[in-house]
């Protein structure tokens, strides 16, 4: 796959060489305007290794001077067959023009050769093959939402093409013979990693059939975005046609323009805030055996549930098991203002400044607009809306010792003669939490990749992974209620834990498969991407899974079995991954049959449990 991207880059390099040659020696068949077209060129867009993602080069199109057509039916038939167009479309083009008509832009060399032969044989009177200069995107769909596109008229319409139009566009020329070239824009994108994420994203789109899917990869040390896969996407070459065949939905750049409730992934930021405020410690305990419930004088009642009773748990286990109840109880330790101020430092409620159009600020309401339930629900990732890029940027805090970095898509701007005009380096914005808090959260996230953790499918043997999954119900803007069918499944992964180099964020909007939890479908996608990166860049892998240091924990915290005391609890609906700690109980004989969720159990809820008791669980 890496050879594929490099090969495309090599082909594009040949085009550059050809372009320079053409700009010098192309003769003018139509006077000075033709010469100016050859000498005034828009700058190229390159990936971080210098591989071409956008370039202005010589192209060909088919035109017809309709008064010279002697056999209309034969001309339509030959053009349609050679160009792969419906005959009706060709006929419509010719019949709607009294004189000059362009039938197709950007024809291939094969189409050009076939048409030239037909012209030589006298079968296409009035048909011409014309050279012109246009924008070519040799990588096609890859990172198309980043690169953007020009319209057929050469106007920059989206992406880096539009944001950096002043740099890419050549300066005005005073005469037809003055050469003018635009600057080159070098992106942070790595086409090798981009190809990996695109391939994995397309497989996931086919399997899960979601409305959209995003995989973003960032260099954790610099804030540079290495891959930006946002599906559905498009081929920017289509816009060089007079009538581009583009699904409008594919043009939506969702990672920057759309905001959604992040769900449980947000707990890594809410608990980091509480930890840094010193209102919780790693040794605290929260009772997640039952529902979190609060009644207020306003008669408002809050009830927050977990998938299963987790017993008395630590803050680390709130992350490991993704306990909503635990997160809600932890949020009770602070006031609204302090909680809001800490989370605001992560960048929520504000645009990141990424150089793409239409960036959303998300939604993080001021405290004056909070209800009695807001603090508890925000702690678990509801009542706050974020973009995928905001989540990626916020994660830099955990990967950089508590410092927030600005996300980058552009590395540098280079003049036509190779001089670096501007270089965009690592940009620290502010210290959000202490380095100790950041390290602690990474260690808590690492426990989520253990067998009982919600991110266990993100684990890679021999590589320390910190990850947190999320599953958020979509909120209806009309009714204010949560959908029972539409979800956003996501995962945030940072690795290696002890020396973060990469941040990967995956968000899947409204998956339509049998599974929809972030731990079920987003975590495996992260693992696939991370595995390829580990192999690609040569991250060392230990022979066995590295043990998690627990210097912050003086005593091992209780796991799920703590929820089972003298009486049997109701485990109906509990997923298998949350049952695994029961197998470690030496005082119980636990048997698990099947996979999925508990549908039947023996003994029944409420039965007395004694040492040596047998517990039989059937899953489907």
Language model feature labels by segment:
Residues 54, 220-264, 269-508:
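Beta-lactam-recognizing serine transpeptidase/beta-lactamase-like catalytic domain environment
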Residues 1-241, 259, 337-350, 358, ...:
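Periplasmic/cell-envelope proteins involved in peptidoglycan metabolism and beta-lactam response
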Residues 590-611:
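BRCT (BRCA1 C-terminal) domain core and associated BRCT-interaction motifs
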Residues 609-620:
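Conserved "repeat-terminator" motif of extracellular CCP/Sushi domains
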Residues 101-122, 128-141, 145, 149, ...:
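Conserved SxxK-family serine transpeptidase/carboxypeptidase catalytic domain
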Residues 167-178, 363-368, 553-556:
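Flexible hinge/switch segments at interdomain interfaces of large molecular machines
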Residues 177-183, 248-255, 564:
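Bateman (tandem CBS) regulatory domains
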């Amino acid at each position: 796959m890496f050879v594929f991207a490099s090969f495309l880059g090599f082909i594009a390099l040949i085009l550059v060489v050809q372009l320079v040659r053409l700009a010098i020696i192309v003769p003018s068949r139509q006077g000075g305007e033709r010469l100016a077209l050859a000498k005034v060129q828009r700058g190229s867009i390159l990936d971080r290794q210098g591989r071409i993602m956008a370039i202005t080069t010589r192209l060909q199109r088919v035109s017809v001077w309709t008064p010279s057509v002697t056999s209309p039916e034969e001309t339509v038939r030959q053009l349609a067959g050679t160009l792969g167009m419906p005959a009706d479309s060709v006929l419509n083009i010719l019949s709607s023009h009294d004189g000059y008509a362009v039938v197709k832009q950007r024809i291939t060399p094969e189409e050009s050769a076939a048409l030239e032969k037909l012209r030589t044989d006298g079968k296409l009177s009035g048909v011409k093959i014309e050279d012109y200069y246009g924008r070519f995107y040799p990588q096609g769909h890859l990172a198309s939402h980043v690169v953007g596109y020009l319209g057929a008229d050469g106007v920059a319409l989206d992406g880096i093409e539009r944001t950096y139009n002043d740099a890419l566009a050549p300066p005005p020329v005073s005469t037809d013979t003055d050469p003018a070239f635009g600057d080159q824009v070098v992106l942070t994108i790595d086409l090798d990693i981009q190809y990996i994420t695109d391939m994995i994203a397309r497989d996931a789109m086919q399997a899960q059939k979601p409305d959209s899917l995003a995989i973003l990869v960032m260099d954790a040390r610099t804030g540079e975005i290495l891959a930006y896969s946002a599906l559905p996407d498009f081929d920017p070459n289509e816009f060089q046609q007079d009538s581009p065949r583009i699904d409008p939905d594919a043009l939506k750049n969702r990672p920057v323009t759309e905001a959604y409730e992040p769900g449980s992934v947000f707990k890594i930021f809410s608990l980091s805030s509480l930890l840094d405020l010193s209102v919780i410690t790693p040794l605290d305990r929260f009772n997640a055996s039952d529902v979190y419930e609060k009644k207020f004088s306003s008669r408002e009642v809050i009830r927050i549930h977990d998938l299963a009773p987790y017993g008395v748990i630590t803050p680390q286990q709130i992350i490991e098991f993704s306990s909503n109840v635990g997160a809600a109880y932890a949020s009770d330790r602070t006031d609204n203002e302090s909680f809001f101020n800490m989370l605001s430092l992560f960048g929520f409620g504000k645009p990141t400044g990424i150089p793409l159009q239409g960036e959303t600020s998300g939604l993080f309401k001021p405290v004056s607009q909070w209800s009695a339930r807001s603090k508890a629900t925000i702690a678990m990732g509801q009542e706050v809306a974020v973009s995928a890029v905001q989540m990626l940027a916020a994660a830099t805090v955990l990967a950089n010792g508590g410092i927030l970095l600005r996300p980058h898509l552009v590395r540098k701007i280079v003049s036509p003669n190779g001089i670096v005009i501007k270089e965009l380096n690592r940009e620290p914005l502010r210290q959000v939490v202490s380095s100790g808090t950041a390290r602690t959260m990474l260690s808590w996230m690492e426990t989520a990749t253990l067998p009982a953790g919600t991110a266990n499918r993100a684990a890679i043997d021999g590589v320390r992974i910190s990850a947190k999954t999320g599953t958020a119900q979509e909120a209806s803007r009309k009714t204010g209620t949560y959908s029972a069918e539409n979800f956003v499944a996501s995962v945030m992964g940072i690795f290696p834990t002890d020396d973060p180099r990469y941040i990967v964020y995956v968000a899947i909007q409204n998956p339509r498969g049998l599974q929809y939890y972030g731990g079920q479908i987003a975590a495996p996608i992260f693992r696939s991407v991370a595995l390829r990166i580990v192999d690609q860049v040569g991250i060392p892998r230990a022979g066995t899974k590295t043990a998690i240091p627990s210097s912050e924990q003086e005593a091992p915290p209780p796991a799920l079995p703590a929820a089972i005391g003298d009486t049997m609890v109701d485990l109906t609906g509990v997923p298998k991954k949350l049952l695994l700690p029961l197998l470690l109980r030496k005082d119980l004989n636990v048997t698990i049959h099947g996979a999925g969720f508990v549908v039947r159990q023996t003994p029944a809820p409420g039965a007395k449990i004694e040492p040596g008791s047998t517990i039989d669980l059937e899953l489907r």
